[in-house]
């Protein structure tokens, strides 16, 4: 009996070896035919997300993770080869977005996302004030400005910094040539994220729109609000000749007018230190741990804290549902402002679904007014 079992085991092993040799041969042939722009479908055996190393063995929780609400995406071959691990392609079709007017007369929020090159994706939110002109200008021109800078500059933080400054300068020229004097007091926040090779995430921001990454179910803040409450920003405003005054709700404003210290536009406050130079953050994604990126405007941020945003999104089946859930939750919490969310799914989408949601009882129910 023992010898018979041993012979059966040996024969089984030989069959497995033959299968692996055949698979290796197929992989080698595919590798020779591969071009840098070629993306591999998950249905092909050479780079399945459930067989990342082509061994014929399914991935375990430790390798990548298998969960109920996962989004099956193709694998980006060149980055996967470069980094030595499977990098899922982020499909723009799966990006979720929603924008609600709230109790305002007009929705001054704008958002956008696009594939700029084979390697770089673009995501952005803009929250206008003093009319939608500045937000519209950014929405119309920022994408092209970034695209034009990419061939000349490899560092994405530098690309975004230059783009913000160029757009601000272009808007200034546009406003001064216009007969509409209201453009001189129109401004906008800007939070822009670039994703290169599905791994390198860079975020630039001015104002109080935010970006956060959900890693292992917890929020990782990628932006910091530019408000007069920040000591460094307040000192910078004073050094430039501006001042900070508080309104009846105890909210600080630059020159008694603007609730932020950095923005695109607001041309009448440039001499008082309101600048368009963004603060930037660079981070490397780990798709086994990172569920999504979410960009939000202050109609959400002043009502829903970062952990709540993570929890609400993690409860949803897909990013489109998640974006609507977050914006609608802000409305239910009593926000009066426009509310916009852009949700970008990553490799761990659905992995950290939590049956419990942590609520904050210290939320502010004051209007997030930009004007004193």
Swiss-Prot record:
Belongs to the PP2C family. Mn(2+) 2 binds at residues 127, 298, 337. This is Protein phosphatase Mn(2+)-dependent 1K. Keywords: Hydrolase, Manganese, Metal-binding, Mitochondrion, Phosphoprotein, Protein phosphatase, Transit peptide. Interacts with E1 and E2 components of the branched-chain alpha-ketoacid dehydrogenase (BCKDH) complex. Interacts with both BCKDHA and BCKDHB chains of the E1 subunit. Interacts with the 24-meric DBT/E2 core of the BCKD complex with a 1:1 stoichiometry; the N-terminal region (residues 49-61) of PPM1K and C-terminal linker of the lipoyl domain of DBT/E2 (residues 145-160) are critical for this interaction whereas the lipoyl prosthetic group is dispensable. Competes with BCKDK for binding to DBT/E2; this interaction is modulated by branched-chain alpha-keto acids (BCKAs). Pathway: Protein modification. Its cofactor is Mn(2+). Residues 94-346 form the PPM-type phosphatase domain. Mn(2+) 1 binds at residues 127-128. GO terms for biological process: branched-chain amino acid catabolic process; regulation of mitochondrial membrane permeability involved in apoptotic process. Gene3D superfamilies: PPM-type phosphatase domain (3.60.40.10). InterPro entries: PP2C, PP2C_BS, PPM-type-like_dom_sf, PPM-type_phosphatase-like_dom. GO terms for molecular function: manganese ion binding; protein serine/threonine phosphatase activity. Its main location: mitochondrion. It comes from the Eukaryota.
